[in-house]
Amino acid sequence: EEAGWVQVATSQEIGIQTGSYFLSTDKYISENTDTLAKFLQAVDESTQYINDHLDESAEYLADKLGLKAEDFKENWKNYSFEPGFSEEATTHLEDIEKWGFEHGSFPKDYNVRDFINTDVAKIAFPDNVTIE
């Protein structure tokens, strides 16, 4: 707003939710499976801590990162960490790949499922891996 921007709507208001995925090579996964599982568990624990202590976390991060605490809290409402790997997430990636191929972002069409490795997620959150 200070630069002249005016917020028209939030991502929540228009139903946009972004997803993110952790990427690695098969070699790194096979050599560091337990460490990566602990990493996923730590991300989940950190997310829960922030959810349970949002005001305190926002103030801390505002101080450390130069953010406004209220901006962090507003953005955090759009964040969710769902550990594991769901069929829904797989379908989302397939939709992205299809769109990318159809719009010339990818030189060839490929099967997303050939690149998904759930070994780590099955260790860290076995009940949350629902990819078929």
Language model features: what each stretch is:
Residues 10-18:
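A structural motif
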Residues 101-132:
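Conserved C-terminal helix/tail region of periplasmic/extracytoplasmic solute-binding proteins
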Residues 17-18, 79-80, 116-120:
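Short secondary-structure boundary/hinge segments and terminal tails
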Residues 4-6, 24, 123-126:
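Short low-complexity, flexible loop/linker segments enriched in glycine and/or proline
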Residues 30-107:
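Secondary-structure end/capping motifs
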Residues 1-11:
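Ligand-binding "clamshell"
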Residues 19-34:
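A bilobed periplasmic-binding-protein/Venus flytrap-type ligand-binding module shared by bacterial periplasmic
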